[in-house]
Amino acid sequence: IQPNHPDSVKLRFNWNAALAQDPFSDCGLYFGTQFVHYTTDCGNNWKIISPDLTTNDSLKQKQGSSGGLTFDVTGAENYTTIICISPSPHDSKVLWVGTDDGNVQLTKDGGKTWNNVGQKIKGQPKNGWVPQIEVSPHNAGEAFVVMNNYRQNDWKPYVFHTTDFGAKW
């Protein structure tokens, strides 16, 4: 995958970095750092289509000493990164994003604006891990969000459901 990203923008990567195929383009790919990156030419050229979608909590980051990886027991990044990207199969402008610090972000205009719909989820664990968002193949505004909170020794599973693009859960 090329070209190299400009050094002026520091990126945060996760061992479980998000990668998703655009269902409307054979060569369209999404990739997650703290930003959503998008290519229309199978990875030859990339553009950033989002702001930082994480909490960007600097207390959880060790970029200066890790080269972009936040330390955990393994030395891998596990805070303030995107770990899930789920494009809608209904509309090419709709994209759901989950982060490793509890955000569930949604764009309905191809990345021009973003809404942290996760803030509306009652009962979610604070700073939970959002490894999966499953968009309904039948209903445009419907999605299931999976969260976990094992980093806080909370082993309960969390699954949330919306039918209206995250307005209610």
What does each model-identified segment do?
Residues 1-169:
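Beta-propeller blade termini and top-face loops
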